[in-house]
């Protein structure tokens, strides 16, 4: 028998020291738990994160009310449900909330239950989580998008762009990809030290040096790649997360300097950076409602680089369909807490693959030691994973889980494809 006997939720803390929800689901004496992450720069259309805004003991950031709702309501509603019936369970959770953006129960409460159910199902079946998610029979490992310099909302320096990342495009295995990133990161650390800057890290483990312009950061990264013995744009690619929602004012953007400029000027500046620094991926280059700007950039780049929608799509099927019709992007970032259940997330991934989009599984800036997204990336045959740098254990834990899976798969293990 695989009937859920009880569900216990508790308040724990994420990597930024903020309260979050951990939910443990039981089938008799067997249990599995999941911790919900939290974002810093969030899209307007994301599912709602419920907090106790009137609880002054935790400065309005506690999650004690959603924890209580799980323990008193969801636990009773899901009792005796078959733990393997993920879709049925998720649909009940969606109905319990009854709002478009999960504002009644909160996506943080719902997701912690949804993931814990899948983990427990895998445990009872005695199979790895990624095999319990399998979209197809491939066991392909994703390319890591490693955040090596933090800016924007993830750091307190003057950088406009939120994340400067590297991707080891010529890696023949996941472990080789991590090794390549490791070398570049160490060379970058040495360069930052020589400049007299601190090598302290931001929320996602990337360095946060006190430099004030995007090009200075890009030049540093190119130098680190070269010193590592790699070719920029071939062996290792530079990728950006602009988080342009944070830089939008009166239909103008302050992406490339503090001065706000038009969409056309911003696109010209992007094209210069792409050509000069061989950038292969740009996430959220424009605001979440600026569909025409996205389309212009995609056309100007002739679909030759990865244009990734995060705040644009918020892991939402309706938003993705609009983006597809507008020809706005060619890739989607997948964040489970943006939509709130595994079932809804899988629907988005399946549609993205159907229309030829690359899927990139992502952490959040407020994350935890939970490694579920590592299995999720392989189980959904996603092209890339974005889960920070080789620093901070809540980031490294995901890479370590992928290394374990690669080792377990042995000769069956292979890397995904980077076009």
Please provide the spans of the model-predicted regions.
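Active-site-proximal beta-alpha loop/turn segments in soluble metabolic enzymes
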Residues: 163-174, 198-214, 243-256
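Catalytic core of soluble alpha/beta enzymes
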Residues: 215-419
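Glycine/serine-rich anion-binding loops at beta->alpha junctions
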Residues: 13-15, 98-117, 144-156, 201
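Mobile "lid/hinge" segments at catalytic clefts and subdomain interfaces of large enzymes
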Residues: 139-202
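Short beta-strand elements
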Residues: 11, 21-38, 146-168, 223, ...
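Short, Gly/Pro- and small/polar-rich lid/capping loops
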Residues: 1-20
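Metal- or metallocofactor-binding catalytic centers and their adjacent structured scaffolds
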Residues: 37-127, 131, 178, 206
């Amino acid at each position: 028998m695989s009937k859920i006997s009880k569900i216990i939720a508790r308040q724990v803390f994420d990597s930024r020291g903020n309260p979050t929800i951990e939910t443990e689901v039981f089938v008799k004496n067997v249990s599995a738990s999941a911790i919900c992450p939290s974002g810093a720069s969030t899209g307007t259309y994301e599912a709602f994160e419920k907090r106790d805004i009137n609880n002054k003991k935790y400065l309005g950031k506690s999650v004690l009310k959603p924890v209580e709702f799980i323990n008193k309501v969801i636990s009773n509603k899901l009792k005796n449900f078959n733990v393997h019936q993920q879709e049925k369970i998720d649909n009940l959770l969606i109905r319990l909330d009854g709002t478009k953006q999960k504002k009644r129960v909160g996506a943080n409460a719902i997701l912690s239950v949804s993931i814990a159910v899948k983990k427990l199902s895998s445990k009872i079946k005695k199979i790895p989580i990624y095999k319990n998610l399998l979209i197809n029979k491939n066991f392909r490992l994703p390319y890591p998008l490693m955040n090596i310099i933090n800016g924007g909302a993830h750091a307190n320096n003057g950088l406009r762009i939120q994340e400067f990342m590297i991707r080891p495009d010529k890696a023949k295995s996941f472990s080789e990809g991590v090794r390549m990133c490791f070398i570049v990161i160490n060379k970058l650390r040495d360069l930052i030290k020589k400049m007299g800057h601190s090598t302290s890290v931001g929320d996602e483990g990337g360095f946060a040096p006190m430099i004030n312009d995007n090009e200075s950061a890009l030049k540093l990264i190119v130098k680190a790649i070269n010193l590592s013995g790699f070719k920029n744009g071939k062996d290792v690619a530079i990728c950006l997360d602009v988080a342009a929602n944070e830089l939008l004012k009166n239909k103008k953007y302050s992406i490339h300097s503090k001065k706000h400029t038009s969409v056309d000027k911003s696109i010209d500046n992007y094209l210069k950076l792409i050509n000069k620094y061989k950038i292969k991926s740009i996430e959220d280059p424009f605001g979440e409602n600026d569909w025409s700007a996205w389309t212009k950039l995609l056309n100007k780049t002739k679909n030759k680089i990865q244009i990734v929608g995060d705040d644009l799509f918020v892991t939402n099927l309706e938003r993705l369909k609009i983006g597809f019709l507008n020809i706005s992007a060619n890739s989607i970032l997948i964040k489970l807490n943006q939509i709130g259940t595994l079932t809804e997330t899988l629907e988005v991934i399946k549609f993205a693959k159907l229309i030829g989009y690359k899927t990139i599984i992502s952490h959040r800036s407020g994350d935890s030691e939970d490694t579920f997204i590592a299995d999720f990336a392989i189980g959904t045959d996603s092209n890339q994973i974005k889960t920070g740098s080789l620093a901070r254990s809540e980031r490294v834990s995901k890479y370590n889980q992928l290394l374990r899976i690669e080792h377990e798969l042995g000769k069956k293990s292979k890397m995904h494809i980077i076009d």
